[in-house]
């Protein structure tokens, strides 16, 4: 106990800030001094699972729930007007909005800079978050999980600018439902990072707009169909888009984009119908609009495309933009997805330096193009001969004969190739055998060519 008495108050508060609020409160048994210091802890972590012990069934007992709510109220009352930095509130049972509004209002008034709010109800229920309390000149990071934004009757509140967070830099929306479109970003003039994961709109095929002049990083991931999506984000430098194909992309303003990762979600049935000639399927007809998305990111320097995305681009080859700034291109392959768009894509990257292929095996069609060696044609390798790529990385390599033929194809037709990196799948023995075969192939190639390709072979790693 003598050691505890000698610990400075500031250090004790710092230690308590790493504990959940319940655990920090339990330290009051050590001394009355520690209980008083709880009022000055700058981080609050309120989690009902720690208090209610759901594995023991306590969450289902009303008196236990009420006891926890009373505990939260006492903690906030004890702290009074003391400044607070980080607050995390996580609940798995129903709360009345007035109580939550009161908690949020309390911590915002005390200058909270990071707020994480999660009220995870049952599968078909969502907590409707009010906007009337959301005004703060100190909040820098806000994360919302499994909440509803807007109002059922009309799209006001969050969506009509009733909030104002002038210092907010990071906004994370995880499994959040919207009534209306995403327009409240205008109330966030300093926003730099926006993450939207599994968001959905209660109104069918809503036209969504993401508009913010200061936004630098945008991540969107959703398995829900939507209407059109517009992006008016002129300062964006990083864009990650994992989503079903939108109905349209009317506006894509990303003039300063440096890096993009595009993974479009499609079903097997949609892929099959898209490959059919003159298909008038409503969903398939929207796929060529992906060309508008690609045109909007044409200034990108690093681009990562999924196998689905590459196949979808085959429906908009005629509108494929020239990626004049692109230095690094990474493409994921799949045996059930085609490379039809690969030739025009490579031809439209006049300054490409690094090409990363995550797998070589793909779905072969008569429109597979001249980028691979799958189909015999007179103009073999034409798209490769115009590509200035210097470094070729091949991942998920298994050493099959088909893959070996493709390695030879790349060596024959990439005129500027200087370095070949191959990451081999399989056990050590298989990797060693494949490495020896490839090394011999490179040796023979360098003897018969003016080039001097350097080979790097290793086991596959992320």
Curated annotation (Swiss-Prot):
It holds the Pfam family F-box. It comes from the Eukaryota. InterPro entries: F-box-like_dom_sf, F-box_AtFBL13-like, F-box_dom, FBD, FBL60-like, LRR_dom_sf. LRR repeats lie at residues 118-146, 148-175, 197-222, 302-333, 334-359. Coiled coil: none annotated. Keywords: Leucine-rich repeat, Repeat. CDD domains: F-box_AtFBL13-like. Residues 1-47 form the F-box domain. PANTHER family: RNI-LIKE SUPERFAMILY PROTEIN. This is F-box/LRR-repeat protein At5g38396.
């Amino acid at each position: 106990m003598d050691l505890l008495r000698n610990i400075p108050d500031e250090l004790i508060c710092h230690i308590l800030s790493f504990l959940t609020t319940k655990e920090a409160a339990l330290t009051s048994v050590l001394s009355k001094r520690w209980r008083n210091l709880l009022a000055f802890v700058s981080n609050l972590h309120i989690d009902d699972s720690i208090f209610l012990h759901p594995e023991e069934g306590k969450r289902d007992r009303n008196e236990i729930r009420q006891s926890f709510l009373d505990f939260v109220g006492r903690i906030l009352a004890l702290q009074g007007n003391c400044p607070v930095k980080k607050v995390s509130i996580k609940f798995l049972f129903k709360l009345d909005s007035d109580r939550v509004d009161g908690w949020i209002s309390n911590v915002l008034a005390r200058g909270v800079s990071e707020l994480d709010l999660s009220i995870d109800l049952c599968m078909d229920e969502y907590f409707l978050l009010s906007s009337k309390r959301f005004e703060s000149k100190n909040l820098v990071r806000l994360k919302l999980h499994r909440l509803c934004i807007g109002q059922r009757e009309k799209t006001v509140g969050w969506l009509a600018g009733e909030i104002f967070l002038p210092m907010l830099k990071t906004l994370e929306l995880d499994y959040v439902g919207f009534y209306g479109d995403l327009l409240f970003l205008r109330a966030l003039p300093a926003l730099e990072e926006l993450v939207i994961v599994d968001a959905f709109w209660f109104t069918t095929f809503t036209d969504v707009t993401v508009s913010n002049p200061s936004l630098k990083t945008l991540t969107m991931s959703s398995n829900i169909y939507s209407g059109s999506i517009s992006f008016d984000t002129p300062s964006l430098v990083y864009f990650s888009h994992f989503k079903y194909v939108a109905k349209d992309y009317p506006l894509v303003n990303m003039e300063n984009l440096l890096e993009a990762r595009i993974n479009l979600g499609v079903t097997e049935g949609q892929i099959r119908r898209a490959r059919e000639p003159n298909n008038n399927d409503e969903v398939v007809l929207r796929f060529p609009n992906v060309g508008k998305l690609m045109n909007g990111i044409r200034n990108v320097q690093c681009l990562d495309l999924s196998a689905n995305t590459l196949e979808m681009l085959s429906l908009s080859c005629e509108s494929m933009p020239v990626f004049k700034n692109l230095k690094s291109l990474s493409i994921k392959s799949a045996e059930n997805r085609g490379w039809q768009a690969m030739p025009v894509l490579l031809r439209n990257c006049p300054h490409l330096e690094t090409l990363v292929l995550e797998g070589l095996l793909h779905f072969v069609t008569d429109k597979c193009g001249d980028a691979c060696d799958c189909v015999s044609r007179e103009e073999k390798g034409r798209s490769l001969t115009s590509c200035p790529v210097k470094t070729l990385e091949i991942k998920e390599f298994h050493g099959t004969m088909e893959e070996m033929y493709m390695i030879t194809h790349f060596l024959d037709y990439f005129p500027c190739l200087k370095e070949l990196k191959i990451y081999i799948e399989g056990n050590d023995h298989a990797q060693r055998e494949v490495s020896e075969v490839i090394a011999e192939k490179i040796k023979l190639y360098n003897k018969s060519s003016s080039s001097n390709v350097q080979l790097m072979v290793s086991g596959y790693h992320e």
